[in-house]
């Protein structure tokens, strides 16, 4: 199981703990009266000590498995990428394959260590804190309790409505982190971990390939082609490219360079979420068999593919909301979730049926609860 999936499980398990703690104060929320709300709040807050320990124990138990998954996807799989690329390079150069270089293993060790440090510091350690102001799970629990009490005591909602709505609001948002990007966007646990893991693994594999090219003193490569591509990749996908910039004495002016198409930047070639790969190319030896797609059509298809990704995220989110709704006993929301899930799945089916380059990827629509 991928590190991203393990963090999704972690978040959903923690939400389950919060919901169970709330139910533990008054199992039948339908019986809770407005005048009992202040007393209910006090009883709910008293449970925070036990809830804190429960969350900490669970995170401690899961952390080694997550750390191993991160190590495997970066170091173990990255090593396989390097070995395979070296084999391909040796074949086209008619050489004996070289073992993975020290530079490559150091690169893999560095990326694995950096990734786990970022995840551990920004996610795991915060969930291990006994400080209610720093632990995101406890902050969410307190927020649900306090906002629900306020909504009831001011006459805005019934106890059941207030509790149901506040739980659902947080499930939609996800457990928070303290991270805020340049645009002011606050990262959730799931969003942050998925982005870090996806971005780092793709970057690692591409850097491993680039290092192999250096190890074999090669500067040309074939860039894979896809029917759907981002703006930066569409003009050069499927072509032979330079992996060095214009100023390098080994630069071959017959071919474009990835540096002219945003290489090294998030939105550029081989940037964040870019699925393109580089393959060895030797002039006079290698035959480029990549299919060539119209540039504008590939960009348009890329936008359509992003719509599929959006629908898939919505299916996952509604499934998470459904799980929480069923756990707390919110039957109306659970029914609404079922309807929304079917609606987005229908949109995915239609999109896939109308576009031959798309395929249905059920794993992208599922959460661990639905598997």
UniProtKB/Swiss-Prot annotation:
Residues 336-367 form a coiled coil. It comes from the Viruses. The keyword Lipid metabolism does not apply. Glycans are attached at residues 124, 146. GO terms for molecular function: structural molecule activity. Its main location: virion. GO terms for cellular component: virion component. It holds the Pfam family Phage_min_cap2. It is found in: Virion. Keywords: Coiled coil, Glycoprotein, Virion. Belongs to the Lactobacillus delbrueckii bacteriophages ORF1 protein family. This is Structural protein.
